[in-house]
Amino acid sequence: MKLSIIVNKYLLIWHLLYQSSVSDEIHRLKQKLWQDHKKEYASIHKDKILILSSPLDFIPDDDYIYNMVESSIYYKKLKQETNKYRLNVMEVWDKNRKKYNEELEKLLKTDLDCSYDICVIHPSLDVVESDLSTKTLTIGKRLILKDKDNFLTYVVYKIVKNEFNNIKTADRDIVDAITELLITNELYTRITRESKYNLGKKSLKEIKHKIYPYFLMYLGVNKNDFEKYMIRDNIFFNINNYNYISYLKNIDIYSFIDFIIKSKESILGIKDLNDSVIEVL
């Protein structure tokens, strides 16, 4: 997994114009631009998709509004802060990427051979977005060094979730639950060396708990150690109700997802009138 961390001024300006205002000065600037140049302001709304599809090469059809924002003293200050933020993100990633890539490969049991452009915008915008049609992530979220692993794990989660969108299946909840188990829970636990299995969406909690015993088998946890993991993660089940499926420890994540989907009636109690087989694009 390779990350290219960049600042795209057009994307930064777009978010300043269309997200909640980061300051009173920017709010007043937006109001004035809308009052005086409503047509031009509205016309650049479509640019976001175009920027994300080619962040290094994007050139707007009409740069009038962009130039108006760029010439303001308020923007120049925000641009400087965004450049500083980019350097902070780069430094944190450079110091930790080896550890994250190694642990991620162990968990996936396959190489996540992908490259992403990480477009950083001002951290006060509080934005983390992934575009399903591109390999681009937009990040504008405060980075506190003592909480860097939370930040980096969330970035990795967004990337893996985006990659798993290539899996063609109607059972998205199962894929999303396994993504959380992998990244939000197990990867974060390994990185911080303390259980993070209390994290995740409430809507996925029941599915995750039903998958959890099989996930331990996938991780290669010996049945004799199940109790230790249950105590660690505060997720409990009757060990005697589960046959240990030893081959799960030898398959990769895509095969594991396929196994859970095919076994969803017995594991999750979900019936399907049609055969559900995953296909990776």
Regions from the PLM with identified roles:
Residues M1-H37, A170-Y229:
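Post-HExxH zinc-binding segment in Zn-dependent metallohydrolases
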Residues M1-K79, K84, N88:
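N-terminal low-structure segments adjacent to metalloprotease catalytic domains
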Residues E25, L29, N88, V92, ...:
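Charge-rich, solvent-exposed alpha-helical interaction surfaces
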Residues I73-S133, R190-K196:
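Auxiliary, metal-adjacent structural segments of Zn-dependent hydrolase domains
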Residues L125-V127, L143-K146:
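Short acidic, S/G/P-rich loop/turn micro-motifs used as interaction or catalytic elements
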Residues T136-L145, F164-D173:
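Short helix/strand-bridging catalytic loops that position acidic/His residues to coordinate divalent metals
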Residues N150-T169, E180:
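Active-site recognition of the HExxH zinc-binding catalytic motif
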Residues E206-L281:
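Pan-zinc metallopeptidase signature
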